[in-house]
Amino acid sequence: MTTILRIDSSIKGEAAVSRRLTQRILDRLLEAHPDATVVSRDLAQGIRQIDGPWLGSVFTAPEQRTADQQEIARTADAVMAEVKEADILVIALPVYNFGAPAQLKSWVDHIARRGESFVYTETGPVGLLTGKRAIVAFTSDGTPLGSELDHASGWLRQVLGFVGITDVDFVAADRMVFGADEAMARAEAAVAALAA
């Protein structure tokens, strides 16, 4: 059975274009995988930023963690497990000031863990999360996908590839201030054309 992990990150809640787009992508995937299990994580509801106690907790063997470390590591381990168990990731990438939202960066920090999602070898890093697909809902007011102003999509593609997820598609509703209806129509067409 297919497991789909949906990651939303906009602070705009239900009014977010990226949230509407991740829902459309999810609907498209469910047409092809009606029995899929869907796991959703809304990063705007909060995800811990990494810090010293976080680092000490997640890199301590579970059986050696203190009670405080167990509590800190609980969410980090749950986030990591969600990604490991997913076959398809649907990730909202709203562009804030040319980059990704801080909460999406925090999610990436939770999943880019040496020994869990990648290892270093003599020939370089090797991602461990292979065999997965990611579909990214890229939204922006004025930043075109892939432009020199876009510091979000290349970063996310790099991070996903680093952990082994190389099958990545982008669906863009970009430059919304220059025509929201046209941008959404292009995004809808891209969703319809997705190989599910």
UniProtKB/Swiss-Prot annotation:
InterPro entries: Flavodoxin_fold, Flavoprotein-like_sf, FMN-dep_NADH:Q_OxRdtase_AzoR1, NADH:quinone_OxRdtase_FMN_depd. This is FMN-dependent NADH:quinone oxidoreductase. Keywords: Flavoprotein, FMN, NAD, Oxidoreductase. Pfam families: Flavodoxin_2. Its cofactor is FMN. It comes from the Bacteria. SUPFAM superfamilies: Flavoproteins. It catalyses: 2 a quinone + NADH + H(+) = 2 a 1,4-benzosemiquinone + NAD(+); N,N-dimethyl-1,4-phenylenediamine + anthranilate + 2 NAD(+) = 2-(4-dimethylaminophenyl)diazenylbenzoate + 2 NADH + 2 H(+). Binds 1 FMN per subunit. The keyword Lyase does not apply. Quinone reductase that provides resistance to thiol-specific stress caused by electrophilic quinones. It is an enzyme of class 1 (oxidoreductase).
